[in-house]
């Protein structure tokens, strides 16, 4: 996970990453559309208007899906919200 500015320069990075499990694709796309969009094979990018929705989903995420990545994602969401033209990237392989 990384926050990038509009020119692609990294502003902040997570210490770790999201460990992909079979649980993530099982999320209900109606209740978790932001998290459901994540893929281990491609990038997912969230802008400043999508980040509040992502934060709401992280708050509702069942405990089985948790881990250090959730706190790191929250921290990076705050970085996006604290500036302009910032984007949170979940980088796939």
Task: List PLM regions with ranges.
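Acidic (Asp/Glu-rich) sequence patches and key acidic residues
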Residues: 1-93
């Amino acid at each position: 996970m990384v926050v990038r500015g509009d020119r692609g320069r990294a502003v902040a990075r997570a210490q770790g990453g999201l460990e992909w499990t079979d649980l993530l694709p099982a999320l209900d796309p109606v209740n978790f559309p932001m998290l459901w969009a994540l893929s281990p094979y491609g990038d997912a990018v969230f802008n400043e208007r999508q980040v509040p929705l992502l934060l709401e989903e992280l708050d509702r995420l069942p405990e089985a899906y948790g881990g250090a990545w959730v706190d790191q994602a929250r921290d990076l969401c705050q970085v996006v919200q604290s500036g302009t033209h910032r984007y949170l990237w979940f980088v796939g392989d």
